[in-house]
């Protein structure tokens, strides 16, 4: 379990108050593979998602399109175990150091790839350079 559930004297989680939330109450989050340093994905968290992530040791994001908490892997089984939660120097970006579970190597992207950052700009065009590890249609039934 992560060591960030310390409550202030008034019962509130004071460490959450140090995060600079945007006007919608969200903070951008980067998920990075702890073992390799690979950047897996970018997402958003609200206060509840960040608190749940710290409590569970599992990545919980806020889905802007669904308007609700999104427990990473709830549909795909591709869960992210969180080893460390970091806050950047401006307190407005969160970095999760994770182990991506559910497939070997771990699949973080809904396209069936290890990382959501699979396109590289080459000669003025975006080219997919990382392979699809599993057909998304077989992941999301």
UniProtKB/Swiss-Prot annotation:
Catalytic activity annotation: 1-(5-phospho-beta-D-ribosyl)-5'-AMP + H2O = 1-(5-phospho-beta-D-ribosyl)-5-[(5-phospho-beta-D-ribosylamino)methylideneamino]imidazole-4-carboxamide
Binding site for Mg(2+): 88, 90, 92
UniProt-annotated location(s): Cytoplasm
Documented EC number(s): 3.5.4.19
Superkingdom, natural source: Bacteria
GO molecular function, one term: magnesium ion binding
InterPro entries per record: PRA-CH (IPR026660), PRib_AMP_CycHydrolase_dom (IPR002496), PRib_AMP_CycHydrolase_sf (IPR038019)
Pathway(s) of this molecule: Amino-acid biosynthesis; L-histidine biosynthesis; L-histidine from 5-phospho-alpha-D-ribose 1-diphosphate: step 3/9
Gene Ontology cellular component annotations, sorted alphabetically: cytoplasm
GO terms under biological process: L-histidine biosynthetic process
Stated family: Belongs to the PRA-CH family.
Functional description taken from the UniProt entry: Catalyzes the hydrolysis of the adenine ring of phosphoribosyl-AMP.
Assembly and oligomerization: Homodimer.
Name listed for the protein in its UniProt record: Phosphoribosyl-AMP cyclohydrolase
Gene (name only): hisI
């Amino acid at each position: 379990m992560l060591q960030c559930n310390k409550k202030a004297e008034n019962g509130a989680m004071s460490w959450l108050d140090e995060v600079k939330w945007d006007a919608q109450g969200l903070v951008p989050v980067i998920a990075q593979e702890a073992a390799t340093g690979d950047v897996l994905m970018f997402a958003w968290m609200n206060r509840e998602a960040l608190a749940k992530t710290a409590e569970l040791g599992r990545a919980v994001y806020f889905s802007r399109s669904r308007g609700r908490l999104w427990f990473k892997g709830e549909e795909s089984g591709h869960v992210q175990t969180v080893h460390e939660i970091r806050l950047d120097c401006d307190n407005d970006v969160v970095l999760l150091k994770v182990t991506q579970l559910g497939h070997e190597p771990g699949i973080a992207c809904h396209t069936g790839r290890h990382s959501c950052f699979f396109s590289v700009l080459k000669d003025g065009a975006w080219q997919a350079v990382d392979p699809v590890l599993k057909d998304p249609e077989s992941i999301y039934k």
